A protein has these predicted regions:
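RNA substrate-binding interface of SAM-dependent RNA methyltransferases
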Residues: 67-148
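A mid-sequence, solvent-exposed acidic-amphipathic segment
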Residues: 139-165
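Short, acidic/turn-prone active-site loops that include or flank metal/cofactor-
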Residues: 65-66, 157-159, 174-177, 194-198
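A C-terminal functional module that forms or caps the active site or interfaces directly
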Residues: 165-180
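Glycine/charged-rich beta-loop-alpha catalytic/anionic-binding loops adjacent to active sites
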Residues: 19, 70-74, 167-168, 184-192
């Protein structure tokens, strides 16, 4: 049975009862049709899930579960102008428990107005839908920092094999691909396919392979 999860980063092990704000109450009662004493989880986004019951417009905490990240993947992705695909990518990276998501421009990135609040809400929605105890650190940057990202995925790179070393920090290129100058800044280049992949497909595939 589906148990809804609420993201509340301020919760800690001392919390016994957590009142819910109106927007959460409306979603639980009107959308999910929850009743008193139904199960509810609360995630602090840092690896802790608080298990409780929905009672009198609050969550009464019964127990707590602690989780450790199996990996600490850090990924750079460019902006996508197609909002549906951009949202899909952010949601899936959140569900896959990516630790840090850098979002920035590349030479071939189309000019796009970035709504940081909207991106945060996409990730929040994915956390609450999937029930993960982890929330990614999302950083909006002007350009890629090659001192952090020395590995990229590109169709000109080496074939990624089963015995290839796992990397947890890597960059995904834009729809138009990396420029030769950008590629020269990476120490390591791998490819996911012999054919060009869309940015969202490449990001999700790369994370899945490196988990």
């Amino acid at each position: 049975m589906f148990t809804p999860t609420i993201y509340f980063p301020e919760i800690d092990s001392k919390t016994q009862t957590m009142p819910l704000e109106d927007s959460k109450l409306h979603h639980l009662r009107k959308v999910l049709r929850m009743k008193d004493f139904d199960n509810v989880n609360i995630s602090n986004g840092q690896g802790q899930l608080f298990i409780g019951k929905f009672v009198n417009d609050s969550v009464q905490i019964n127990t707590q579960k602690n989780f450790q990240r199996k990996n600490k993947i850090c990924i750079f992705i460019p902006y996508l102008r197609e909002k549906n695909r951009f949202r899909f990518m952010i949601e899936k990276l959140t569900e896959l428990n990516v630790n840090r998501i850098f979002i920035g421009k590349t030479e071939n990135t189309q000019n796009t107005k970035v709504d940081t609040l909207k991106i945060h809400n996409w990730a929040l929605s994915a956390l609450e839908q999937s029930g993960t105890p982890f929330f990614p650190k999302i950083e909006i940057v002007e350009t890629i920092d090659y001192t952090i990202f020395d590995t990229c995925f590109d169709i000109t790179g080496r074939v990624l094999k089963n015995d290839s070393p796992k990397v947890n920090t890597f960059a995904i290129g834009p729809e138009g691909g990396w420029t030769p100058e950008e590629l020269s800044n990476f120490k390591f280049k791998y490819k996911l396919s012999d054919f060009s992949l869309r940015t969202d497909t490449a990001a999700i595939s790369a994370v899945s392979l490196m988990m």
